[in-house]
């Protein structure tokens, strides 16, 4: 096993599925990372391994964080990509959850480590969660689209296939690495309203969790997420109502959503490229920011 993979224990797993989510460009409104974090909590997941961040991050961009423990001791936290294992209720299989951060460098090596561990654990399906900005209203359920390494997977899991072409993130690179290794892989994408892109989107997280549960054939109690969705919707609605132009725009999106149902228009390659440029510019500004303390 590669040195970059730090494995504390090897769990005994039953027909495991790997579920991944990465903070960063593939995590609009933090929908994917919120979903994965909720699943880890709901399923009682336990950490068993991680990836050494040393070779995969520019620490001037993805800086480590210092925090105080009991008001005295300083704790240093590095960018983390951690693997957790959990039993999935109601079905005879287990889950491996990878909660991480999109790396800055060496994406092919990074994804090869994930594939290597997947093969070692005899994982037979990889499901990557993502969330993207789209022309959807905050008052309706987040539509979910998907892609897969094989046409049979799209048909088997009833995915609404994506025809997107353009820039990609670590989810797309992992998807390709799985295909090259002969590992079945599916990606699920929830739509996040672009006009509230900076706010965490529990609605997107809920849609991803529900779609994943349906794909796996299990039931998921999501009362906590549903309550967060209600609060999110109320707060955004109040903010939107303060601007008549935005209110009118949202009403147009609502009308279109009601007509189209669960489908939505995936942004074009040019739109995604513009979003990538904006994201990278914001990351650069964050990396160049002055620290508040030593």
Region locations from a protein language model:
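N-terminal short beta-loop-beta anion/metal-coordinating cradle
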Residues: 1-100
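Flexible, glycine/proline-enriched loop segments at strand-loop-helix junctions
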Residues: 22-26, 98-107, 157-165, 195-199
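Conserved active-site and cofactor/substrate-binding residues in soluble primary-metabolism enzymes
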Residues: 30-34, 105, 109, 165, ...
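Hydrophobic/aromatic beta-strand patches that form the interior of the parallel beta-sheet core
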Residues: 49, 96-98, 127, 184-189
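Internal, conserved structured core segments that host functional sites
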Residues: 93, 101-152, 174
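Catalytic cores of processing enzymes, dominated by hydrolases/peptidases
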Residues: 135-215, 219
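A conserved C-terminal secondary-structure "cap"
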Residues: 196-294
């Amino acid at each position: 096993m590669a040195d970059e993979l730090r494995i504390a224990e090897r769990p005994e797993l039953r027909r495991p599925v790997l579920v991944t989510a990465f903070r960063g460009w593939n995590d609009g409104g933090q929908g994917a990372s919120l979903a994965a974090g909720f699943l880890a909590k709901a399923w009682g997941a336990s950490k068993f391994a991680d990836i050494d961040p040393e070779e995969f991050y520019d620490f001037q961009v993805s800086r480590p964080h210092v925090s105080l423990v009991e008001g005295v001791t300083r704790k240093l936290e590095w960018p983390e990509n951690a693997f957790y294992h959990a039993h999935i209720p109601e079905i005879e299989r287990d889950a491996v959850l990878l909660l991480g951060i999109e790396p800055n460098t060496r994406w092919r090596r990074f994804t090869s480590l994930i594939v290597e561990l997947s093969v070692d654990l005899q994982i037979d399906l990889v499901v990557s969660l993502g969330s993207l900005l789209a022309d959807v209203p905050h008052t309706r359920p987040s539509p979910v689209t998907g892609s897969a390494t094989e046409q049979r997977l799209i048909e088997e899991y009833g995915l609404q296939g994506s025809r997107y072409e353009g820039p990609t993130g670590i989810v797309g690179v992992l998807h390709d690495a799985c295909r090259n290794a002969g590992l079945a892989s599916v990606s699920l994408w929830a739509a996040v309203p672009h006009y509230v892109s900076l706010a965490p989107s529990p609605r997107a997280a809920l849609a991803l969790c529900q779609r994943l549960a349906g794909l796996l054939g299990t039931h998921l109690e999501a009362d906590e997420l549903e309550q967060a969705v209600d609060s999110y919707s109320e707060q955004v609605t109040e903010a939107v109502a303060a601007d008549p132009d935005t209110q009118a725009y949202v009403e147009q999106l609502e009308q279109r959503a009601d007509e189209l149902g669960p489908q939505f228009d995936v942004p074009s390659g040019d739109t995604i490229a513009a979003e990538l440029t904006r994201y990278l510019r914001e990351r650069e500004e964050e990396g160049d920011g002055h620290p508040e303390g030593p």
